[in-house]
Amino acid sequence: MKRIAFVFSTAPHGTAAGREGLDALLATSALTDDLAVFFIADGVFQLLQGQKPDAVLARDYIATFKLLGLYDIEQCWVCAASLRERGLDPQTPFVVEATPLEADALRRELANYDVILRF
């Protein structure tokens, strides 16, 4: 089976991309264990706790990221540069445990995957 990477690069709640990506990730996890999740650019906002999507009439899907462990999805990476650019600290408690990587290391890790799906 091919190695699959899911890359979240958009902010939550502005579009359905994050929710659709999470749904695809959970569905794919039933078919393979060889996958990983990457949070880059505005996608790092997907990791923040305490969001209030109901204020913009959006569905609260962010809490579903907490289920990644139950689906045996353990390879989660977050771009350290993206965190800094957005004023976020890598020590921030995120909804899922994601390992911060600098951009070069993140690119090298991403190169290990055969299929890259971006949301």
Curated annotation (Swiss-Prot):
GO terms for biological process: tRNA processing. Keywords: Cytoplasm, tRNA processing. InterPro entries: DsrEFH-like, Sulphur_relay_DsrE/F-like, Sulphur_relay_TusC, Sulphur_relay_TusC/DsrF. Gene3D superfamilies: DsrEFH-like. GO terms for cellular component: cytoplasm. Its main location: cytoplasm. It comes from the Bacteria. It is found in: Cytoplasm. Belongs to the DsrF/TusC family. Part of a sulfur-relay system required for 2-thiolation of 5-methylaminomethyl-2-thiouridine (mnm(5)s(2)U) at tRNA wobble positions. PANTHER family: PROTEIN TUSC. Heterohexamer, formed by a dimer of trimers. The hexameric TusBCD complex contains 2 copies each of TusB, TusC and TusD. The TusBCD complex interacts with TusE. This is Protein TusC. The gene is tusC.
